[in-house]
Each structure stands twice: as structure tokens, then as C-alpha cells.
Amino acid sequence: MDDILEVRSLTKRFQGLLAIDHVSFALQRNEILGLIGPNGAGKTTMISLISGTLEPSEGEVIFEGVSIRRLPAYRRGRLGIARTFQVMRPFPDLTVLDNVAVGALFGATGHSQVLQDARERAQRWLEFVGLDRRAQQRAESLGGPDRKRLELAKALAMRPKVLLLDEVMAGLNHVEIEEVITVIKKVRDQGISILVIEHVMKAIQSLSDRLLVLRNGEKIAEGRPQEVLSNEQVIAAYLGTKRHE
């Protein structure tokens, strides 16, 4: 087993609220790990702790065998951890191309890039996600589905080893969801390990090698999708009651 990322007893408190409660798991190289759970379970908080946008109260985040708990988000990006955000805030006055170039400039090896090189890399990732036709438009002109593609392209331009995806399929129709699934699988084929939060259960089931389930900040299940989704605790978490014989 070759783990690229490990979370050890990670805990986050917001004053009196225990948002993440001593959660441990590992993401293997070239794996897609689905992170699911009801609203308020702590999923986005978890990837914020991994990416460095939040600081843990306790526990460790280990990346390629080294603790990164005390590193700020930009240093984690330099190492090769990138994420998308559930609430998309592109730079509205920049073109779509230059939004993605920002990711290229501030990701792994980005500090040595010149703008033209970053734009060339950005163009390749726009083609990868199917957004190259809008490269010269201002980002503020994009609709919801295309903003999600932009978020993904910007994260990929950082040259990540680990990609954290936060509900990139929310609000999409069936055809758009299938397109995003195809893109995510192509990302994994590039050798990138992926932790993905998603509420579209059919999509997450077909995408993921394994599932991790949170409820009220606690890990309640982990394993292959079929066994996890038949777990009594998982059923209770989503339905609000245990299934009786």
C-alpha cells in the first residue's frame, strides 16, 4: 500500500463546536477516494484542513511521509496539493485563460514560471476540461457549469499530486455530470490522486475506488463503495433512522 496523503486523528473545534472528531484515513497514490456524508458532516472542513485554509486543533496531515500541519496553504500548493471550492469566486476582470494561468503561477514549480509559459499551460488545461472555446472571455461571463470547469482547470494548472474536489457536480444536469466524471477519470489517468466530495450518489459510486463517510465530524465507515453504501450506520446517517429487520 503506497499512501501519498495520511490524516492522523485530525480534529477541528470552532469554539464549542467539534466539527472534526479525531478522524484518520489515508489516500493512496493514483486513487479516487470519495468523501460523503449528510450536510454538516464536516466534509468541506476536512479538505480545508488538508489544504491549509483551516488550521487543525489536533492531529497531523502527512504528505509524502512528512508532516505539513504547520505549513500555510500556499506552501502546500507548492508541494503539490490543489483544491476546488464549493463557492466559486473566479477573478471576474481576468479572462478565463488568465484565471487558469494564476493557478499555473502559484502551484508546484510555479514560482519559476514566466507569464507566457503559465498561459501556455493554462491553455492546455482549458482544452482538457473542454473550456478552451471561452479562453478569451472574462470569467464573470461564465455560467455555473463552466465556472466549475474553470475551477477544475485552475487547480489542475497547479500541477498537483493530490487534488481535492468539493462538489464539482453540484447543480449540473445528467449530461454535464457524465462529462465531469469522464474528466475526473482522465485526471486520475495523469497519475493524480483525488479526494472528492460529492452528493450525487450514483456519480460518486461509479467514480470512487473507496468511500469514506463522515457524520457529525466522525468517521463512521470506510471501504469499497458497495459495502459502505449497505452499511447500517451509513443508511441511518442519510435516512435519519436505522433500518429494522
Predicted regions and their residues:
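Conserved ABC ATPase "signature" region
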Residues: 115-134, 161, 182-185
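Conserved ABC nucleotide-binding domain
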Residues: 69-70, 125-146
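A short, surface-exposed alpha-helical micro-motif characterized by mixed small hydrophobic
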Residues: 204-206
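Catalytic Walker B motif of ABC-type/P-loop ATPase nucleotide-binding domains
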Residues: 163-167
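Conserved ABC transporter NBD signature motif
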Residues: 59-66, 79
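The feature captures the beta-strand-to-loop junction immediately N-terminal to the Walker
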Residues: 36-38
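Helix-to-loop junction immediately C-terminal to a conserved catalytic motif
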Residues: 51
